[in-house]
């Protein structure tokens, strides 16, 4: 299966799916310093107890949420857990609030009657009342529509947060909810509307996109995840694609690499981020290596 976006709006769908999902084969023969494969990495530096960096997929698929034994062992041994954001009740409330407009605008007035009616029809079929849809930001409606119907389970990141709290581990965040939601709020109204239009047009292939990402993730194939992301941008507006990839992936990689330094200096940490952030020339594995850490693939 090879799903290839063909419109400017599709780059948003693919990149957002990759970013939000990120997002079991054997790789014993892959070179450890290539960073092309593997989800769990030991991070070491002289004089500090080693820590672990784990690539997640923001999915409730049973094959994703059940931690493999090496990952579970690293998690259990950690003195604290660091996620992209702390998923406590207040953060979840903030995320939910960020989906809605509070300036008096209504979705219909921003996107027009025809697109609004199509959005409401699909949302209603999924059990979401128009009263709620009417106050959504255009990007928020699109992101919700990207979630397959029935995909309402607890995703891996929430499992890690829940288990850390249950085990009495301190939980840290590399980013704030405001920073993550700001990635979408910063999109122009034109781009938000294009995203919503293209999401509605491509509802039938979003499931296929997610399936392809899931296969790459369960194969621990970081190189393939990068290829899927890069393929999504080939036929898209170059400036639009570059800007979105820079903001959603690259800039966040540098920010997270810097912010995890205090955790790594403490040692015995379990740090979990979307798997797409691990690989590539500007991925976290390469950035940590350049800072003098030794990275060893564990799983």
Outline where the language-model segments fall.
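N-terminal secretory signal peptides that target proteins for export/translocation
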Residues: 1-10
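Bacterial N-terminal signal peptides
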Residues: 13-26
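Boundary at the C-terminal end of the N-terminal hydrophobic targeting segment
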Residues: 28-32
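A conditional alpha-helix N-cap/helix-loop micro-motif detector
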Residues: 33, 64, 249-253
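Alpha-helical scaffolding within the catalytic cores
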Residues: 35-39, 255-256
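Structured, acidic catalytic/metal-binding patches in enzyme active sites
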Residues: 39-244, 248
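A cross-kingdom marker for long, charged
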Residues: 242-299
